Amino acid sequence: MRVLPATLLVGAATAAVPPFQQQFQQVLGIPQEEVEQAAPVAPSAPTTPKPLQIFQDQLKSLSDEARKLWDEVSNFFPDSMDHNPVFSLPKKHTRRPDSHWDHIVRGSDVQGVWVTGADGEKQREVDGKLEAYDLRVKKTDPSALGIDPGVKQYTGYLDDNENDKHLFYWFFESRNDPENDPVVLWLNGGPGCSSLTGLFMELGPSSINEKIKPVYNEYSWNSNASVIFLDQPVNVGYSYSGSAVSDTVAAGKDVYALLTLFFKQFPEYAKQDFHIAGESYAGHYIPVFASEILSHKKRNINLQSVLIGNGLTDGYTQYEYYRPMGCGEGGYPAVLDKGTCQSMDNALPRCQSMIKSCYESESSWVCIPASIYCNNALIGPYQRTGQNVYDVRGKCEDESNLCYKGMGYVSEYLNKAEVRQAVGAEVDGYDSCNFDINRNFLFHGDWMKPYHRLVPGLLEQIPVLIYAGDADYICNWLGNKAWTEALEWPGQKEYASAEMEDLVIEQNANTGKKIGQVKSHGNFTFMRIYGGGHMVPMDQPESGLEFFNRWLGGEWF
């Protein structure tokens, strides 16, 4: 089915635009062959679900305004509306027997624990619906992989047996003082990209070189913290499912269950401070996940703060800063010509109008067109230049691997049979990013929903750090600084007026070196990191570890 075409608005992107599938493929850097393989549709299968086929009945009841939005984006992307299946396909997998695992923590057992409260009444030890969940745990031999020998490691799966979901995690104990150092959960974005890319390309104990061998990382974030890397949502990385998660809120329930069962199995870590950190689409995830945790008053998760790096959190504010960043106003030379910059300026009012409608209704019918239109008008022009969307300083060196050859090295390493065996992976293959997941989230309207509205509630209880490498385009520092200043909360005026101060290294051979700028008031802090792209710990490992350690030490809160 196709919706009726509508006249394009003046001010839309003037250059020819790629079809919807190709456009978002470029955002994630996923090769065409992977997209085609991920959605094999036989010509003789006319009943394969398609976005507008699935929505056909509901479209009849749309308001005139919503229908016009769909008409508009259909005119931009007619082919994509006909040919893209909505739902992700299950990954091939072989579940390992229970005897493979050292521990299996049953959610039903945890939920069944009752204690006597201060008032003498019986109450559950921890909140939450956990009976459908299990946690499988295996102590991993570091020597088998050559990754951080001497550091305790655990891998395993969180199982949602009711919904056939299985999330893979990899835990590294702190190199320093694991009995006292904090615990951090790390999340990559996408949506649909594996957190193991963060492990091996950014902040984990090893990177993978061109010989597909692990190389020790002296700037690993487990230098002074224990770190959990989680492949979520399902069907990302080593995780798998027969069903799908298509929005951030649903994914939050899984993360709460994982942490609750993990800390039940390892109470020695539960007593430590706990923090959530992540980047990119984790700007959506983290406000939701932290709010989910804090909503449970009886919990064994000692959440102390959250850190979001180069995140997408408030689209209305952040999309305004694509044109300035691409046109030379972000501290680096312009990538786009004057005509393109003007076209983006012309498109912005319509984009923001659509995002505003999404914020007001939070309806998928309104939020999906906003995502498609705004990404086409404000990200598409930059993509067509061939420049790296994650770093304005250079060209995209490897389109099949998010512009980075290192991403391919990581995928090749994690697809080795001996690696999958060592960590207990149950899938037949590893993918750095799953395009189907990205599309699922978009077609559920998740991309533009106002998750930033949860941040004031977080600020009432815990500190929040927003940091941004200043060479990134896709989630650039201008937009991240702007949304933090626009956020409505009791400390808004004081925070917005706070001056940016130099951020300098304090304790090593480079003491006094300026690595960025920082501003802070109350529980809210923003950092600009010089010379960092979308992945700060990869581009500026020393700077990343410096601010990370100082943040966990409580310097700004």
UniProtKB/Swiss-Prot annotation:
Residues carrying a glycan: 224, 523
PROSITE patterns linked: CARBOXYPEPT_SER_SER (PS00131)
Compartments reported by the entry: Vacuole
The keyword Lipoprotein is annotated on this UniProt entry: no
Keyword Cytoplasm among record annotations: no
Family annotation (Pfam families): Carbpep_Y_N, Peptidase_S10
A GO term from the CC aspect: fungal-type vacuole
Matches recorded under InterPro entries: AB_hydrolase_fold, Peptidase_S10, Propeptide_carboxypepY, Ser_caboxypep_ser_AS
Propeptide: 18-138
Domain of life, source organism: Eukaryota
Cysteine pairings via disulfide bonds: 193-433, 327-341, 351-374, 358-367, 396-403
Family per record: Belongs to the peptidase S10 family.
Protein name listed in UniProt: Carboxypeptidase Y homolog A
Lineage: Eukaryota, Fungi, Dikarya, Ascomycota, Pezizomycotina
Gene: cpyA
